[in-house]
Design a protein with these regions (language model features):
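Domain-level signature for soluble enzymes in the chorismate/prephenate branch of the shikimate pathway
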Residues: 1-218
Length: 218
């Protein structure tokens, strides 16, 4: 399971686009199988976690697999009514399985964010749209460095939507931070905020400027 942070740190990939997808999990079974036949359920660890209430309430034994589609394929090939997969509706069509229960996820409002990434840097022109600027930075080693570095965003009224820390390789006291903000890098408020941040940084790298997914407006 390769995380976005791995791709960014190892290959210095840039972000071109974001897309949010509503997560909908279904219980897929061999055609004709009933809920009382099911003993084992297979899926990706995240899908199993997102459907934990359903799994527990039915007394199923959860088995972790590499991905949801692969779980559906395995259940189809084994052709055992005691086995089920948690996967998408598309997987049911692909592997000739029946959807026994739809939308079994614990949180019906769960979303997953997908990013389109690549080597070259490309960004939309600054206009009358909602943008996200994503960047990576490493702070100078000093007390209260993170607190001081973020002050410029508050002063200039720039909203941070994401801030995640990652330890530098073979270090317990040096961290990189992955950050998203609302705004285009050519916006003066954003520029002033990043200039202030830069005073506290050893390393700074813009990962991408892209239009915000429309779901952020809801």
């Amino acid at each position: 399971n390769i995380g976005i942070e791995y791709l960014i740190f190892k290959y210095r990939l840039n972000i071109y686009l974001e897309y949010f997808q509503k997560i909908e999990h279904n219980l897929l079974v061999i055609p004709g199988a009933k809920i009382t036949d099911i003993k084992n359920v297979y899926s990706h660890s995240q899908a199993l976690s997102q459907c934990s209430n359903f799994i527990k309430s039915n007394g199923f034994v959860a088995h972790v697999r590499a991905d949801t589609a692969g779980s559906a394929e395995m259940v189809s090939k084994n052709n055992d009514i005691r086995n089920a997969a948690i996967a998408s509706a598309l997987s049911s069509e692909t592997y000739n399985l029946e959807i026994l229960k739809k939308n079994i996820e614990d949180d019906r409002g769960n979303l997953t964010r997908f990013l389109i990434m690549g080597k070259k840097i490309s960004q939309p022109e600054f206009g009358n749209k909602k943008y996200i600027t994503s960047f990576l930075f490493k702070l100078k080693s000093k007390p209260a460095a993170l607190y001081q570095s973020l002050g410029g965003f508050a002063i200039n009224g720039v909203n941070l939507t994401k801030l995640q820390s990652y330890p530098e390789k073979n270090s317990f006291d040096s961290y990189f931070f992955l950050c998203d903000l609302d705004g285009h890098i050519e916006d003066k408020k954003v520029q002033k905020s990043l200039e202030e941040l830069g005073l506290h940084c050893e390393d700074f790298h813009v990962l991408g400027v892209f239009e915000a997914d429309k779901i952020r407006e809801k």
